[in-house]
């Protein structure tokens, strides 16, 4: 059975065979669905401050 993963930045589903998995030196992994998410994470932007992420949508509804 193929596992689907979710993007650790924006929360979108990642299709099998796509996306990027980044492994830190301590062994922890981070999954990104696109280069857009990866670059925003590298720039240090918080997902709750970016309009197009799931975390931002949750804050707006509350």
From Swiss-Prot:
Gene name of the encoded protein: rpl24e
GO molecular function annotations of the record: rRNA binding; structural constituent of ribosome; zinc ion binding
Free-text cofactor note: Binds 1 zinc ion per subunit.
Gene3D superfamilies: Ribosomal protein L24e
Oligomer and partners: Part of the 50S ribosomal subunit. Forms a cluster with proteins L3 and L14.
GO cellular component, as recorded: ribonucleoprotein complex; ribosome
Protein name: Large ribosomal subunit protein eL24
Organism of derivation: Halobacterium salinarum (strain ATCC 700922 / JCM 11081 / NRC-1)
Coiled coil (UniProt feature): none
GO BP terms, alphabetized: translation
């Amino acid at each position: 059975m193929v596992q689907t993963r979710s993007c650790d930045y924006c929360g979108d589903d990642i299709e099998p065979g796509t996306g990027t998995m980044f492994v830190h030196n301590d062994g922890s992994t981070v999954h990104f669905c696109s280069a857009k998410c990866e670059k925003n994470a590298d720039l240090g932007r918080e997902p709750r401050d970016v309009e197009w992420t799931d975390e931002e949508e949750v804050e707006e509804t509350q």
